[in-house]
Amino acid sequence: MKVKITGTGSCLPKLRVTNDDLGQIMETSDEWIRSRTGIIARHIAVEETTTGMSTEAADKALKNAEISAEDVDIIIAATVSADKHLPGLACEVQKNIGAENAVAFDINAACSGFLFALDTAALYLEHGGYQHALVIGAETLSKMMDWTDRSTCVLFGDGAGAAVLSASKEDGILSMVQGSDGFRGDVLNCMARKVNNPYKKSDKALSYVSMNGQEVYRFAVKTVPKAVTDAVEQAGLHLEEIDLFLLHQANYRIIEAVSKRLGQPMEKFPTNLEECGNISAASVPILLDNVNNHGMMRKGMKIVLAGFGAGLTWGATVINW
C-alpha cells in the first residue's frame, strides 16, 4: 500500500513577540538576534496550550483532507512540551476531535519528532489495515526557557502543525532516512523534573533548555546534507529534481549552509523562521502548511522534508505531492 499526504493544518498563538519586545526585558537587540539567526519575531502561548493548538491544527488538516475525525485510524503526536505527563498529547487530541476509532500515542524526538512520527505513521499505513493517519508536531517551548539566557530563549517559539496521511494507489512517501547519536546528546538538553520521592534526596533545581550553539551548528551542517542526499538517492532521484526543501527552521545560517553544501539555490528553501522562530517538532509541519496554503506546491512536485535536533536526532523524507 502506498501513502500520500492529503491534508495540512497549523496553529500559532495570538501573541507575536518581536526582537525589539525581547530587548525590553533582557540584554539583547533586534540586530543581535537577526544577524545571528534570521529571526524577527516568534509567537508565545499565553492562553493557548499544546493540546489546544494541536486540536486546532488537527481540525484544519482533517478539513483540508476532506475526511472526518471518525475516519482517522491512528494519531501520532510529536512533542517535548505536552501539557501533561499523562495522558499523552495524542490521546488528548483524540478526545477533543472525537476520533473514537483511532489508536493514539506520542513520540519524543525533539526537532526531528514530526519526521519520526510521519515515517512511523506511513509504515502503519503501508502495512495495511489502516486508511488514514493524523500526524501532529506541537510545542509550547516558552515554558521550558530560561528567560534570562538570551542565547537560547530568543530562538524558540510556540505552535502546532498537523498532516493527514492516507493510503493511496499513487506514490506519496518515496523514501525515509533517520538517524540518532546519543553520544553527543549533551549539546542540547533539558534535564528531567525534580525528584519527588520521600526515599530519595534530590538536589536538582528546575531545569531549562541549554544548548551549545556551535556544536549544534556543526552537527546540522554536516548531518543534514548527507541525510537529504541519502533520502533523495533512495527515492531514485537527483537533487536537481527536487522542487522544494522544507527544513527544520532552526537558524537561517544553517539553512544557507545546507543549501550551499547541496548545491541547490536558496529559492528552493522556503522559510518561516523570520516570524516563527524555532518551534522544534512543530517547525516542519507548520512550514509545510504555510507552503501548501500559499499555493507553492503542485501535484507531482518532489519535496524533501528534513528535521534535526536534540538527541541528537535527524530525519529526511522525500514526498511526491
Residue ranges of predicted features:
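Beta-strand segments within the central parallel beta-sheet cores of soluble alpha/beta enzyme folds
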Residues: 5, 33, 70-78, 105-108, ...
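Conserved beta-strand-centric core segments of catalytic alpha/beta enzyme folds
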Residues: 1-20, 118-184, 288-321
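Conserved catalytic cysteine-centered active-site region
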Residues: 32-36, 40-52, 79-133, 260-288
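Conserved beta-ketoacyl condensing-enzyme motif
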Residues: 5-7, 47-108, 115, 231, ...
